[in-house]
Amino acid sequence: MTHAIEVRGLSKSFRADRKALDDVTLQIAPGEMVALLGASGSGKSTLLRHVAGFVTGDAGSGEILVNGRTVQRNGRLARDVRRVRADIGFVFQQFNLVGRLPVITNVLVGMLTRVPKWRSLLRIFKASEVQAGLDALAQVGIDDYAFQRASTLSGGQQQRAAIARTLVQNAQVILADEPIASLDPESSRRVMSQLAQINRTRKVAVVVSLHQVDVAMRYCPRVVALRHGKVVYDGPSAALTQQMLRDLYGSEADELLHDSVPEAPSCAEGVPAPVMVRMDLAAA
């Protein structure tokens, strides 16, 4: 089976004495919805940026493939990485919209890798492409704002516009880096519901880094947890316990849990045991 995302032995050092990523290996299947959990500085955002090909790993370190095509190997981007990136939608924490441009124009930017270069430079789109953008905005529930400046939208609406951009891009993999970090609870619910719906209806892999444990458990069947750049847990979100999360988050845990995770749940019928690695935070 070709994995939607495959990471093999990836390391990244920003300083000689500290690795942001430490020999990370994981596979994500097409159609999975996976949460990345971990305390601030654990490596979640860094991992997503490597998968997207925005940055490279240490020289001689690891390999990343998306849908079987190489993004980077041994610290060097693949020659055709631009083509691979065309299949990767990225939702940023800070929305990454141009406030002075209409919402529809921001959404159609998702097509730029698939249109002739001269049209991408001039931002000229066919009527059929504009309609596809309007359809994407309708899918996320903000088509009424299509021709307003992006700066007039609320934070939640701007994030939904960013999700619409991945739809017109026809992304096969969606990476979302803390997409609800600055949003109110209702906006957060709408954004996560949209990502979950896209995952279900389009069968694309969605990987979302989160700080909210309860949100991860509600929307993501699988969790990958990082600590100090290492994968310390990879398994069902339903199998997480408060003790595991206290070990993962340390002093932040009580603020994050809010009684959303049982102390020691028994595995529900049909819920597999954690796979690949076990929680061993004392050694991490």
Curated annotation (Swiss-Prot):
Statement: the UniProt record of this protein carries the keyword Transmembrane: no
Localisation per UniProt entry: Cell inner membrane
Classification via InterPro entries: AAA+_ATPase, ABC_transporter-like_ATP-bd, ABC_transporter-like_CS, ABC_transpr_PhnC, MetN_ABC_transporter-like, P-loop_NTPase
CDD domains referenced in this protein's UniProt entry, alphabetically: ABC_PhnC_transporter
EC annotation from Swiss-Prot or TrEMBL: 7.3.2.2
UniProt membrane topology term: Peripheral membrane protein
Residues given in the record as ATP binding sites: G38, A39, S40, G41, S42, G43, K44, S45
Assembly and oligomerization: The complex is composed of two ATP-binding proteins (PhnC), two transmembrane proteins (PhnE) and a solute-binding protein (PhnD).
Primary location: membrane
UniProtKB keywords: ATP-binding, Cell inner membrane, Cell membrane, Membrane, Nucleotide-binding, Phosphonate transport, Translocase, Transport
Encoding gene, per UniProt annotation: phnC1
Coiled coil: none
GO molecular function: ABC-type phosphonate transporter activity; ATP binding; ATP hydrolysis activity
Keyword DNA-binding: no
Family: Belongs to the ABC transporter superfamily. Phosphonates importer (TC 3.A.1.9.1) family.
Organism encoding this protein: Cupriavidus metallidurans (strain ATCC 43123 / DSM 2839 / NBRC 102507 / CH34) (Ralstonia metallidurans)
Name used for this protein in its record: Phosphonates import ATP-binding protein PhnC 1
